[in-house]
């Protein structure tokens, strides 16, 4: 019996008490079930009686005694004790507790999934860095966290759409084009342009793809020429430079294990008239006005610190206008909730996006999530790593992966809460020792895989055998304290997934896996699984082997949620 199943059993007990007239309360949809800190308090505890007492106009202990009497009659419940002011301390029968291992092995990759958000469509946008340079270290964090969050959302029952918003319109594209053009001429980048060896690399590729560009360069007459040839050369450098940079970004993220459902071009919104359509709709809603030759959105009505311009006085749309059009575009595609993962320098966007949501008639608390993450720094041996050889004045995802590999990079970027600054010690996260969290978790999976291979070599049945009978294993024998601890930890995965999705906190998966790995290692050190020497396998051998297989399944499922591999050997 998993914690979720026990919670359902408690809800059923409340429902039965209400139906019988013993309680007069609204039956809750769900109740809290927790693992007590002290093993002597049972396998699980619930404060449900304290939560219902006020509405029932009864003392909490009275409510607890009513529910305890019903729970004691439930199959799989061995003992229920009312403790303190009205807590329910529940101990499961051996077969019910051990049944968690059986359930996990039977469910396989699907174990841990929930349907708590079934039918809700969520759009998750992350990274969305300008296509004017390599993927930076900060963007690497959002790539790892965003991809893990999309996997957690899916596991919690959401219908997820992931997007990268390509900022391929506006001033930054013009500056990048000017930087590429300067590199082609062997000149320094403009003061407001882009630096780094990568600009020269992109320039060489632009020239290789456009042989006629040499003639334009010659005809333009130099950097100060503002004639037609100069404009043509700038246009080619901007267009092709952005396309080449975007192709590199896509390849880098794909190599990092991050794939998107949609790469949405800002330019496409302009070309399709989506910005004008958004303004028209906002005008109809009564939130648009004109002043000083510009068109404004009255966002202060919805908590923003100032109204925002949609169209400048020179007639050009603002970035904010494109943001509003993009919000509208997502909602019109049927997404119920829009989730934006942004960097620390975008904190001001929270109020703006909430105002956009409200101006379109949505409830920001229901339709919008804006998650702000903090920055990442690298160090090696206590010394800060500050410079990328290729990018110049910033560090890149490639720098990190080149130093430690994809698995260590992804895990290390995800395991800390995104709202805390992160300093990664390259030596520490590449080290193959137990004080390195990613190694510790992956090693637990590899250790169990080795155990299962050894079991098969001894002729013992494992879940890999087509004829394996999971129901034939006597899981009631799993009563050793270390076995009970491990079973309790394994049962937590569905709730960890649910909370990670609800709180938008994929780091909870990583921390859970680290605790689980430690619990397994303690079990393995205390409970011998395979027979030694001339010993014959017994029923406890089969039960412990099943428990080990269940642990391997949960470790693999959790690592998959983080986009990290589960190695068979290390």
From Swiss-Prot:
A motif ('HIGH' region) lies at residues 129-139. It is found in: Cytoplasm. Keywords: Aminoacyl-tRNA synthetase, ATP-binding, Cytoplasm, Ligase, Nucleotide-binding, Protein biosynthesis. GO terms for biological process: arginyl-tRNA aminoacylation. One of its GO terms (cellular component) is cytoplasm. Its EC number is 6.1.1.19. It catalyses: tRNA(Arg) + L-arginine + ATP = L-arginyl-tRNA(Arg) + AMP + diphosphate. Its main location: cytoplasm. Pfam families: Arg_tRNA_synt_N, DALR_1, tRNA-synt_1d. CDD domains: ArgRS_core. GO terms for molecular function: arginine-tRNA ligase activity; ATP binding. Coiled coil: none annotated. Belongs to the class-I aminoacyl-tRNA synthetase family. NCBIfam families: argS. Monomer. This is Arginine--tRNA ligase. It comes from Parafrankia sp. (strain EAN1pec). The lineage of its organism: Bacteria, Bacillati, Actinomycetota, Actinomycetes, Frankiales.
């Amino acid at each position: 019996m998993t914690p979720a199943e026990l919670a359902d059993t408690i809800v059923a007990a409340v429902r039965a008490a209400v139906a019988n007239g013993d309680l007069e309360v609204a039956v809750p949809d769900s109740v809290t079930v927790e693992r007590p800190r002290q093993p002597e308090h049972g396998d699980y505890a619930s404060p449900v009686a304290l939560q219902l007492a006020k509405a029932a106009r009864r003392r909490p202990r009275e409510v607890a005694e009513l529910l305890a009497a019903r729970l004691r009659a439930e199959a799989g419940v061995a003992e229920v004790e009312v403790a303190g002011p009205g807590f329910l301390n529940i101990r499961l029968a051996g077969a019910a507790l051990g049944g968690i291992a059986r359930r996990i092995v039977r469910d396989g990759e699907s174990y841990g999934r929930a349907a708590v958000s079934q039918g809700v469509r969520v759009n998750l946008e992350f990274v969305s860095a300008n296509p004017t340079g390599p993927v930076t270290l900060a963007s690497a964090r959002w790539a790892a966290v965003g991809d893990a969050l999309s996997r957690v959302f899916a596991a919690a029952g959401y219908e997820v759409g992931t997007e990268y918003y390509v900022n391929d319109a506006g001033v930054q594209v013009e500056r990048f084009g000017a930087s590429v053009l300067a590199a082609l001429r062997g000149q320094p980048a403009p003061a407001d342009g882009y630096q780094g060896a990568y600009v020269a690399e992109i320039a060489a590729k632009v020239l290789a793809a456009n042989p006629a560009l040499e003639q334009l360069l010659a005809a333009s007459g130099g950097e100060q020429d503002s004639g037609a040839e100069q404009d043509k050369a700038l246009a080619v450098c901007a267009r092709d430079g952005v396309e080449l940079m975007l192709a590199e970004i896509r390849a880098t993220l794909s190599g990092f294990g991050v794939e998107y459902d949609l790469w949405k071009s800002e330019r496409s919104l302009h070309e399709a008239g989506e910005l004008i359509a958004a303004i028209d709709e906002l005008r109809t809603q009564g939130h648009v006005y004109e002043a000083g030759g510009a068109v404004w959105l009255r966002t202060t009505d919805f908590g923003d610190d100032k109204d925002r311009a949609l169209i400048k006085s020179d007639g050009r749309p603002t970035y904010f206008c494109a943001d509003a059009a993009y919000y509208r575009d997502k909602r019109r595609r049927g997404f119920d909730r829009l989730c934006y993962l942004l960097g620390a320098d975008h904190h001001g966007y929270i109020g703006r996006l909430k105002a956009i949501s409200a101006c379109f008639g949505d409830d920001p608390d229901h339709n919008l999530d804006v998650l702000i993450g903090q920055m990442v720094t690298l160090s090696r041996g206590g010394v800060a790593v500050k410079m990328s050889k290729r990018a110049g004045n910033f560090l890149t995802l490639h720098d990190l992966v080149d130093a430690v590999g994809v698995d260590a990079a992804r895990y290390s970027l995800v395991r800390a809460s995104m709202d805390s600054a992160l300093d990664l010690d390259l030596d520490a996260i590449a080290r193959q020792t137990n004080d390195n969290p990613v190694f510790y978790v992956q090693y637990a999976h590899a250790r169990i895989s080795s155990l299962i291979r050894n079991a098969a070599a001894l002729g013992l049945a494992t879940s890999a055998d087509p004829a394996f009978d999971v129901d034939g294993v006597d899981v009631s024998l799993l009563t050793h304290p270390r076995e009970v601890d491990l079973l309790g930890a394994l049962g937590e995965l569905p709730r960890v997934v649910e909370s990670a999705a609800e709180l938008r906190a994929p780091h909870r998966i990583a921390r859970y896996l680290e605790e689980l790995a430690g619990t397994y290692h303690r079990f393995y050190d205390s409970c011998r699984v395979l027979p030694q020497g001339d010993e014959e396998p017994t029923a406890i051998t089969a039960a412990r082997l099943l428990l080990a297989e269940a642990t391997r399944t949960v470790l693999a499922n959790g690592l998959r949620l983080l986009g990290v591999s589960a190695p068979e050997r290390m």
